[in-house]
Amino acid sequence: MAALYACTKCHQRFPFEALSQGQQLCKECRIAHPVVKCTYCRTEYQQESKTNTICKKCAQNVQLYGTPKPCQYCNIIAAFIGNKCQRCTNSEKKYGPPYSCEQCKQQCAFDRKDDRKKVDGKLLCWLCTLSYKRVLQKTKEQRKHLSSSSRGSHQEKEQYSRLSGGSHYNSQKTLSTSSIQNEIPKKKSKFESITTNGDSFSPDLALDSPGTDHFVIIAQLKEEVATLKKMLHQKDQMILEKEKKITELKADFQYQESQTRAKMNQMEKTHKEVTEQLQAKNRELLKQAAALSKSKKSEKSGTITSP
């Protein structure tokens, strides 16, 4: 009896071939709890429910620090503290300032000073490295599948040739060699068309045309999204600066207006006081003039009556 192994989720026992690599999950658990990417940090995690779109670490950070902002280096929405995500912050402390990624052209690739850490001699960021490894794994699986299927078909041909005889085997051999020769130029043309674009990583990946095409399209779309995000960020900064200037001008205008009104009120008050003082002085002078005229009249009347 073959040995059985436990699923890491439901703990039921299955043959080793029925469990997934790495996670060691059965088919039902793989369907119920698929491995998805976190909306914020873009790391792969096992989804517990359909509504849960972020990993446990990001969920804890959201509760502690609130909704994250895009990282100023990699543009991943995972900057919970400051303007940089934790991965870029740690990499900057360890390896220094970032360089431009040779695939997505963003300023988020950190040079580890080790050629073995590079991908085909290229300095790539974290996301592009993961995408490359995914494409490489897919290519290996497809090649393995093709080699196993070709091995099985070869064994079937040998069995069929033993049963049918030598003449039929020779005809089958000529047909198979002609079909292989027809397939070779097709693969060559695919390889040439991919390598002329200059977007593939290596000649080995060029044979896997669907994966590399998807990878190139995804990389181009990421580059466009990154440039649009940068443009949007620049526009937002310009709008914020203009709004700041407008508020400063409004505040200055209000201050100048209040100062002018205060000066006008003060001048009006002083003018009123001066006017009142002059009017009072004028009344006093009029009284003095009237008193003088009366005294003069009385003196004249006294001089007339005295003889």
Curated annotation (Swiss-Prot):
Keyword Transcription: no
InterPro entries documented for this protein: FAM76
Coiled-coil region list: 217-299
Compositional bias segments (type: Polar residues): 161-182
Keyword line: Coiled coil
Gene Ontology CC entries for this record: nucleoplasm
Pfam families, sorted: FAM76
Region (Disordered) residue spans: 141-195, 285-307
Transmembrane segments: none
Family per record: Belongs to the FAM76 family.
Name under which the protein is recorded: Protein FAM76A
Organism, scientific name: Mus musculus
